[in-house]
Each structure stands twice: as structure tokens, then as C-alpha cells.
Amino acid sequence: MNMTHHKSGLRWLWLAVLAFVLDQASKLAVVKLLPFGYPGVEITPFFNLVHVYNKGAAFSFLADQGGWQRWFFAVLAFAICGLLIHWLRKQSVAQRWSGIAYSLIIGGALGNVFDRLVLGHVVDFLDFYWQRAHWPAFNLADSFIFIGAAMIVLDGFRSEKKKDVTP
């Protein structure tokens, strides 16, 4: 299927750019307004704004591995983004759900990879907790990646349901 760019799913890349800009703007605000390691600003009884660094991946996975993981996660993010852009190029702009999902993942992945390559770590600042139990801090890029991935999973369930209903 060879489509021109204006009819392909590449038109959804504006959303990836928006996700990237929102992520970087929020991290810049945190870096400028909250000192690193500050205990946090309580927003609600279960949510703080904090300023922490993550040298690993989700849940600080591989954070204490000496630095190679920075490059590994950067290469992985670029590879995934390349694959998603390839898929966007092959699909129609009318395939909204997957276009949005892929673009959110691309924008989030590039937001975190930018931090890794420029800062050497990812800036996290969203801290949800219950009493003394804190969920690992995360950022908007992580949220965009999660939402995009959840949309892909939900789309898989919707597709399976349609197959079951079809005679």
C-alpha cells in the first residue's frame, strides 16, 4: 500500500511532537522550580510533585548498572520509534486509534531519550502514594507511552471481539 504522506498515518506525527513538547516543558518547569531531591510539594493527600532522576527504565530498572543502560535504552527507543513510524507510513490517516497510540508512544519515547542523551538521566516528578507507600515517580513521557500501549492492547481486544462476532 503506497500512499502519499498526507493520506498516510504520518499525519498523526503532530501528536508525537505535541507529546514531546509537553513532556519537555513540564520537566523544564520542574528543574527550574523544584530543587533536586526536595521532599516534594503536596498537591493532594495522595499526590506530590517531586524532582528526582532515573538513570534506568521504568521503576528504575537497571539504574545502578554503570551507564551502559543509557545507550541501550536510547537505541531501543530509536528502534521502536522507527518501527512505529514505518507502521504509521503504511496505514491510512483514517486509522485514528492506532495513529494516536503510535504517536503518543513516539512522543513519550523521544522525550525520555532526549533526557537520557542530554542529561544522562530522565527527570521524573509525578509521585502518587497511599500513606507511606509511594509508586515510583514518573513523568508525562511515561504517561504518554503507557496510554499509547494501553490503546494498542485495547485495540487488540476490540479486534478479537469483532472476529468472534463475525460469522
From Swiss-Prot:
Cell wall biogenesis/degradation as UniProt keyword: no
Catalytic activity: Release of signal peptides from bacterial membrane prolipoproteins. Hydrolyzes -Xaa-Yaa-Zaa-|-(S,diacylglyceryl)Cys-, in which Xaa is hydrophobic (preferably Leu), and Yaa (Ala or Ser) and Zaa (Gly or Ala) have small, neutral side chains
Enzyme Commission designation: 3.4.23.36
PROSITE patterns xref list: SPASE_II
TM ranges: 12-32, 68-88, 99-119, 137-157
Pathway: Protein modification; lipoprotein biosynthesis (signal peptide cleavage)
Active site residues according to the UniProt entry: 124, 142
Gene Ontology cellular component list: plasma membrane
Pfam entry (one): Peptidase_A8
Family per record: Belongs to the peptidase A8 family.
NCBIfam families per UniProt: lspA
Purpose of the protein: This protein specifically catalyzes the removal of signal peptides from prolipoproteins.
Official protein name in the record: Lipoprotein signal peptidase
